[in-house]
Amino acid sequence: MDERFIAYIPTAGSNVAHAEITSPTLVKMMIRRAKKPILILGENLEENEKELISKLIEKFNLKTIKTPEEMNLMAIMKYLASSDYDLALFTGITYYYLAQAATHLKQFSNVVTISIDKYYQPNTLYSFPNLSKEEYLDYLRKLLEG
């Protein structure tokens, strides 16, 4: 099996319903179709990644919550589960924290979850595959095209 499509931390997958691998093109379409998308932004991003994510926020006019700076991740999950957001994007969050938090959303809400991080996240509904730093930057650039 291709290592790009297995969990970065193999024990992070909580059940048999693992995330579908997605591409920047599909993520772009999902963001455009969403009525109320939100980006949950962690602190584990390098400077060049932050720059591209900032452009993404601006391009798609995404509401953003920074964790842990503005709100605790579990509080964000509870907030999203009871809110009217229909699409939640995640990036820069510590891998195993997001694995647990995304499980909460998967079980207790109708929010479509997408990990746009460089590591495959099995507990979201959609995820980028495991990517090298350069591939990840390329995926982010493709999100900004068009």
Curated annotation (Swiss-Prot):
Task: Identify the Pfam families for this entry.
Answer: CO_dh
A GO BP entry is: methanogenesis, from acetate
Q: Which InterPro entries does the UniProt entry name for this protein?
A: CdhB (IPR003704), DHS-like_NAD/FAD-binding_dom (IPR029035)
- Quaternary organization: Heterotetramer of two alpha and two epsilon subunits. The ACDS complex is made up of alpha, epsilon, beta, gamma and delta subunits with a probable stoichiometry of (alpha(2)epsilon(2))(4)-beta(8)-(gamma(1)delta(1))(8).
Q: What does this protein do?
A: Part of a complex that catalyzes the reversible cleavage of acetyl-CoA, allowing autotrophic growth from CO(2). The alpha-epsilon subcomponent functions as a carbon monoxide dehydrogenase. The precise role of the epsilon subunit is unclear; it may have a stabilizing role within the alpha(2)epsilon(2) component and/or be involved in electron transfer to FAD during a potential FAD-mediated CO oxidation.
Record family assignment: Belongs to the CdhB family.
**Name the record gives this protein:** Acetyl-CoA decarbonylase/synthase complex subunit epsilon
> Which gene produces this protein?
cdhB
